Amino acid sequence: MTTEIMQISLSHNPADARWGEKALISTNDQGVTIHLTSHDQLGGIQRAARKIDGQGIKQVKLAGEGWGLEQSWAFWQGFRGPKGQRSVVWAELPANEKTELEQRLQIIDWVRDTINAPAEDLGPEQLAKNAIDLLCAVSCDAVSYRITKGEDLREQNYAGIYTVGRGSDRAPVLLALDYNPTGNPDAPVMACLVGKGITFDSGGYSLKQSAFMDSMKSDMGGAATLTGALALAAARGLKERVKLYLCCADNMVSGNAFKLGDIIRYRNGKTVEIMNTDAEGRLVLADGLIDASEQNAPLIIDAATLTGAAKTALGNDYHALFSFDDELAQALLTSAHSEHELFWRLPLAEFHRSQLPSNFAELNNVAGGAYSAGASTAAAFLSHFVKNYQQGWLHIDCSATYRKSAVDQWSAGATGLGVRTVANLLLAQAKQ
C-alpha cells in the first residue's frame, strides 16, 4: 500500500495504446489519469476508483479540471471500502456543491457504516438510538421521538414487532420520530417513512442456510436508508413535517420464538397466519404502516430488504419499486434519475392482494404455492395495512442495499443507494 498522496485527474482522451484498448486508467509521473471515453462517465469514474483502491492507493488528491460535485461523489462511491482508512483531498467546488458533498459524506457514509456494522454491535434499540443521533446532528431542534420497547409493544398492540422480536434476548423496538421544523405541533404531516429494522435475521424456525444468513446483519437496510433520506432532506432544507417509523427486532430461534401456525392479530383488525418465520419483515412493517396510515399524510413510503425475489429479478444494481399510484411511482423514478440512482418498477396489481390465502386467518404471511411472484405478493401483503393503498403509497424492496462481495463499481458491503432519491422526492413533494 502506497502512503504518498496520489494525484487523480480526468481526461476525455483515450489512454495510450500501451495501456490496452479502452483502458480506463493510466499512470505517469504526475499520478493517475481516468479516461472518460464512454457515455457512462460517472460510472467510469466509480469503476476507476475501485481499480485505484485495489492497487493499494489509499490517499488521493482530485486534481485538474472536471471534478464537479457528481464526479467527486462518484469517485468516493467507488473508492470507499468497509475496512482500512482512505483520505481524499477534494477539488475546489462552489460553496453550495461543497456543502452538498459534505452532507452526503456525513449522512450516506453513516448509512453504509450502519448497515455494515456486525449484528453483535447493533441491536434493535441501538439502531433506534443511532437513528436519533443522526437526525439530531442534522436538525435536533425539529426532532422529537418515542421509543416503545419489549413488553410495552405487546401492551400497546404492536403485535407484529413484538411477535417477531420476542425470541431474542434483545428486546424489539419501535421508534416513532417526528421531524417537525414548522414549530407548530398541529402542523399536518406531509409524509410518513416506515423502515424495516431487522438487526439480524436467522430466519427463525424457518431457518436460513449459512450461505443466506451470512449477510443478514444488513437486514435493517430499509430502516437505515430511510433514516438517511430524512436526514439528507432536512440538511437540504426540508420545511415540511415528516414522521419516521423504524420497526426494529432480531429474528431468532429460541423457546420463546414465534412458530409456524401462529396467528397474529393486528390493531387494524387483520389476522395473519404464519407459514414462514423467515417472511418476518412484512410482519414488523405492518405495525409501522398502521401507525403511518393514522397520520393521514398524503405520502407513505416504506423500505425494506424484503424479498429474495426482487434480487432475482433485478440483481443488486436496482432497487425495486411497487405502487398502485402511477403518478407517484413516476415521481420517484424522476427523482432517482436526477440523483443518478437506479430504481425499477415491478408489477403490483389488485389480484396480488388475494394471493395470500389462509385456512385459519384473513391473510397468510406468504403467498400460496400457486403464486410465484414473491416480491409482488410481499408488496400486496403490506397494502392490507395501508388505509388508502391505491394512492400516495410507495413500497421499496431494497435489493441494491448491500453486496456480499466486491464488483467493478462497488466494494463489498453497503452501497447507500436510495438515500438521495427518497430525499429528493420528499423535497419535490414539499414544493407541491
UniProtKB/Swiss-Prot annotation:
Positions bound to Mn(2+) 1: 201, 278, 280
Protein residues bound to Mn(2+) 2: 196, 201, 219, 280
CDD domains: Peptidase_M17
Cellular compartments annotated: Cytoplasm
Enzyme class, UniProt record, top EC level: hydrolase
GO terms of biological process kind: proteolysis
GO molecular function: manganese ion binding; metalloaminopeptidase activity
Cofactor note: Binds 2 manganese ions per subunit.
Catalytic activity: Release of an N-terminal amino acid, Xaa, from a peptide or arylamide. Xaa is preferably Glu or Asp but may be other amino acids, including Leu, Met, His, Cys and Gln
UniProt cross-references to InterPro entries, sorted A to Z: Leucine_aapep/pepB, M17_PepB-like_N, Pept_M17_PepB, Peptidase_M17_C
GO cellular component: cytoplasm
Similarity comment: Belongs to the peptidase M17 family.
Quaternary structure annotation from Swiss-Prot or TrEMBL: Homohexamer.
Annotated function: Probably plays an important role in intracellular peptide degradation.
Protein name: Peptidase B
Organism: Yersinia pseudotuberculosis serotype O:1b (strain IP 31758)
Gene: pepB
